[in-house]
């Protein structure tokens, strides 16, 4: 945007890049923690859960910008 924030939809697109290629998304939930700016580095942290994955995009100190949960049916 005009303030150089990362668009909320872009977080989800970035997180989806870390899912296995054959993973079919049935449900998605994003929890936004803080804003990232244009030149911020987003470090992915991926955890396998019972019915899918949680992808957390974090800053260099490990603080989350967003956690996105992707579930299969």
PLM features per residue range, with description:
Residues 1-24:
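Hot-dog-fold acyl-thioester-processing enzymes
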Residues 5-9, 43-45, 70:
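Surface-exposed beta-strand edges and their flanking turn/coil or helix-capping segments
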Residues 10, 27, 35, 72-73:
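Residue-identity detector for glutamine
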Residues 21-54:
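A conserved acidic, glycine/proline-rich C-terminal tail/linker
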Residues 37-38, 47-73:
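HotDog/MaoC-like acyl-thioester-processing domains
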């Amino acid at each position: 945007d005009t303030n150089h924030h990362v668009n909320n939809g872009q977080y989800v697109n970035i997180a989806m890049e870390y899912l296995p290629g054959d993973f079919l998304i049935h449900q998605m939930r994003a929890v936004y923690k803080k804003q990232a700016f244009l030149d911020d580095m987003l470090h992915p942290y991926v955890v396998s859960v019972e019915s899918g994955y949680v992808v957390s995009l974090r800053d260099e100190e490990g603080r989350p910008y967003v956690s996105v949960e992707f579930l299969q049916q």
